[in-house]
C-alpha cells in the first residue's frame, strides 16, 4: 500500500481527484481508514485474522458509500462514481446471499467494482455475482507481486484521469500476472492449506501454524496429483489482534495429525514443539516431556513419551 500511495502522489491528476479509504476483512470487517485525500493519507498496518467474511465486508462497504460519498444535490455537485478494488484470497466464511443481492439491487450500478482473486483458492464464482470485472492474480515467479502492485496503481491513475467520463477505462492485463478470470473453475472451499493457532507456554503469546498441500507429479503424466496430506509451511508469531479480527463462530472443522507432516518449533521461546494439545482443545508449545501450565485455560499438564499412538484430531482455522 505504501508503494501504491507513493506512486499516486507523483501523478497530478490522481493527487487532485482521488480519495482513498481502506476496509479490511478477515473473520470480521472494519473500516481502518475512512475516505481520505491522497496528499495526507497514511498507509495503515493491515491486520491478520482467521476467516473471510465477505458478506460483512460488503455490508461495511455499503455503509461507507452511504455515509462518505457525497451525492449531487441542487445546491452542490457530489463526488464522482466510486471505484472499489476488492482483493480476496479465499472463499467466504459467512453467508453472502443477502449482501450480494442488496449490492446488485442498490449499488452495482453506482459503483465501479473491480474484484481480484489472489491465488488459486479465491472463490471466483461469488466475485462474478458482484461484478463483470473479475481478475485473477497468480504469482509464478519472483517480482510478480511488485508488478501486481504497479498494475493497481496504473488502474487507479487511469480512473482518476477519466473522472466525468461516461465510459470507464478498460482494465489492462499484464501478461500472466493479472488476467481475466472468466473461465476459472469454481472452488467450493480451500482444500490446499490448514491453519492452526497456538500459544507459547512460557510467554503466553499466540502463534499461527500453516500447513500446505503439496502437488505431486507422476513421471510421464501431464497432471498434478494432490495427496491427502499437508506439509508444514511455517510457524509465525502473531499478536492478540488476530483473534479480534477472526470469526469467533465455531466451525466444527478438524484435521487429524496423521495428515500433517512436520512439527514446527515455537517462534517465541524456541521450544522444540509448537504442537501439543491441551484437554481444552487448544494448542501450546512444549520442549519434550515436561509439566506445563496451559496458557489458554490455566490447567496443569504433564507430557511424556509413552510410545503410543500420538495422532489426534485438532480444530483447524478458517484460513
Regions found by a protein language model. Name each.
Residues 124-188:
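C-terminal helix of von Willebrand factor
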Residues 185-197, 253-274, 283-289:
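Short, flexible, mixed-charge glycine/proline-rich loop motifs
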Residues 1-33, 40-81, 83-87, 94-95, 115-125, ...:
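Von Willebrand factor
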Residues 226-251, 299-315:
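Short metal-binding segments enriched for Cys and/or His
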Residues 204-211, 272-274, 282-284, 300-303:
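Cys/His-rich microdomains that often coordinate metals
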Residues 72, 90-130, 137-139:
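VWA/integrin I-like adhesion module and closely mimicked acidic/polar interface patches used
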Residues 200-203, 266-269, 277-280, 294-297:
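Short cysteine-rich clusters marking metal-coordination/redox-active sites
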Amino acid at each position: 500500500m505504501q508503494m501504491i500511495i507513493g506512486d499516486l502522489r507523483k501523478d497530478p491528476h490522481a493527487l487532485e481527484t482521488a480519495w482513498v479509504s481502506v476496509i479490511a476483512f478477515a473473520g470480521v470487517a472494519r473500516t481502518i481508514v475512512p475516505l481520505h485525500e491522497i496528499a495526507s493519507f497514511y498507509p495503515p498496518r493491515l491486520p491478520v485474522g482467521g476467516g473471510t467474511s465477505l458478506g460483512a465486508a460488503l455490508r461495511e462497504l455499503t455503509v461507507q458509500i452511504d455515509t462518505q460519498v457525497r451525492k449531487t444535490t441542487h445546491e452542490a455537485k457530489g463526488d464522482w462514481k466510486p471505484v472499489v478494488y476488492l482483493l480476496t484470497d479465499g472463499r467466504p466464511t459467512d453467508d453472502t446471499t443477502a449482501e450480494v443481492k442488496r449490492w446488485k439491487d442498490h449499488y452495482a450500478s453506482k459503483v465501479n467494482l473491480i474484484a481480484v482473486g489472489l491465488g488459486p483458492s479465491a472463490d471466483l464464482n461469488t466475485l462474478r455475482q458482484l461484478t463483470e470485472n473479475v481478475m485473477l492474480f497468480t504469482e509464478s515467479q519472483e517480482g510478480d507481486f511488485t508488478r501486481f502492485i504497479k498494475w493497481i496503481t496504473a488502474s487507479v491513475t487511469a480512473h482518476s484521469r477519466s473522472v466525468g467520463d461516461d465510459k470507464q477505462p478498460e482494465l489492462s492485463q499484464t501478461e500472466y500476472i493479472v488476467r481475466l478470470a472468466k473461465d476459472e473453475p469454481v472452488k467450493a472451499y480451500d482444500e490446499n492449506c490448514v491453519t492452526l493457532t497456538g500459544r507459547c507456554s512460557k510467554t503466553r503469546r499466540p502463534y499461527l501454524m500453516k500447513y500446505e498441500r503439496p502437488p505431486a507429479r507422476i513421471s510421464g503424466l501431464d497432471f498434478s496429483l494432490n495427496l491427502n496430506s499437508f506439509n508444514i509451511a511455517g510457524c509465525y508469531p502473531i499478536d492478540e489482534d488476530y483473534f479480534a479480527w477472526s470469526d469467533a463462530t465455531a466451525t466444527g472443522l478438524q484435521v487429524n495429525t496423521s495428515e500433517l507432516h512436520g512439527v514446527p518449533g515455537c517462534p517465541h521461546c524456541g521450544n522444540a514443539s509448537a504442537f501439543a494439545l491441551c484437554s481444552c482443545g487448544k494448542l501450546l508449545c512444549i520442549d519434550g516431556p515436561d509439566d506445563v501450565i496451559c496458557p489458554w485455560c490455566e490447567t496443569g499438564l504433564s507430557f511424556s513419551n509413552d510410545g503410543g499412538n500420538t495422532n489426534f484430531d485438532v480444530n483447524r482455522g478458517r484460513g
